[in-house]
Amino acid sequence: MFSKSVTLAQYDPDLAAAIAQEDRRQQDHVELIASENYVSCAVMEAQGSQLTNKYAEGYPAKRYYGGCEYVDIVEQLAIDRVKELFGAAYANVQPHSGSQANQAVYASVLKPGDTILGMSLAHGGHLTHGASVNISGKLYNAVTYGLDENEVLDYAEVERLALEHKPKMIVAGASAYALQIDWAKFREIADKVGAYLFVDMAHYAGLVAGGEYPNPVPFCDFVTTTTHKTLRGPRGGVILCRDNTHEKALNSSIFPSLQGGPLMHVIAAKAVAFKEALQPEFKQYAKQVKINAAVMAEELVKRGLRIVSGRTESHVFLVDLQPMKITGKAAEAALGKAHITVNKNAIPNDPEKPFVTSGIRIGSAAMTTRGFNETDARVLSNLVADVLANPEDEANLAKVCGQVTALCDKYPVYGN
């Protein structure tokens, strides 16, 4: 029998200490990694619930196990809420990750060797959009498009490649592209060659939910997203469709093809996050995310830094560090010493290796969750610039760290 009175700290002090240290780090550091965010206490409560004990292979009302009457309610709540959130007719909330959601979409209508057309990883795409090191680039014949000379998504190239290669599926979406993507244009190109259109909106989903980024669902055959990042939920994935045409194929692609039992505690946490995203205050959050990102990009430009694509129209942007003669790896380390967390990131046509890079990626989702406004964003961007101007000056880093600490103390992640 398990006792509710025994705490993690009592049973496993080493693990509890590591968790406490991470909690402290999240409080004391400003999080600017674009794919990270903070979830609510309600989301964490759901994910830490007894639902983790329940196996539920199958789908609501069609399970292979008994005792699923209550987890059926949980999953149906998640399905109904995410459909309402994005105006979808179909939703599968079981994918354990965005990558598995993407695999399921491919598997539902493609055969090995079929051609897909996706955004180049080197220009801001994602591994799962056909990168050679990913299963999507091994199973399928992947052709890639990129950015034009102005670092804007090259729709003319997309159309030219589509007409030349006749892909069975066109993949849109990105992991490091700051501007808005024209879903209608992608639909037009896909229709010209009879291709399926699949959008991975993992990075932009929270902005879409908040009305601050175009919704791809009406234009696409398939849409996937992660449930974390800007959507501010637990780590996981979702598949959405504008109609039910592919329901049977998608459901069987997830179970039994790619996964076994769904993670019911995570699905419960997804349901909570979807409810939060349906509230009016989430729209204000999404609006502030965009404002903060734009302010930071503008301020960094004023300080002499080069922003890839020149600006941002979302939550994310890339900083090209080549003019400053500093690598992304070195910048990430220096900013980390000042308690500013970013990730090194390749820029278009980057001459450096992926573990070094010539850029950093900055995102505003997590800082906005804490309560940072545009004034704070302006201050923070100048602190970033201060570090990048003198990345090896320990006194400078200590000074910036003190200012970051003051900002963090002003906006505790979870309050007292």
From Swiss-Prot:
The modification N6-(pyridoxal phosphate)lysine is found at K229. One of its GO terms (cellular component) is cytosol. Keywords: Amino-acid biosynthesis, Cytoplasm, One-carbon metabolism, Pyridoxal phosphate, Transferase. PROSITE patterns: SHMT. InterPro entries: PyrdxlP-dep_Trfase, PyrdxlP-dep_Trfase_major, PyrdxlP-dep_Trfase_small, Ser_HO-MeTrfase, Ser_HO-MeTrfase-like, Ser_HO-MeTrfase_PLP_BS, SHMT-like_dom. Belongs to the SHMT family. This is Serine hydroxymethyltransferase. It comes from Neisseria gonorrhoeae. The gene is glyA.
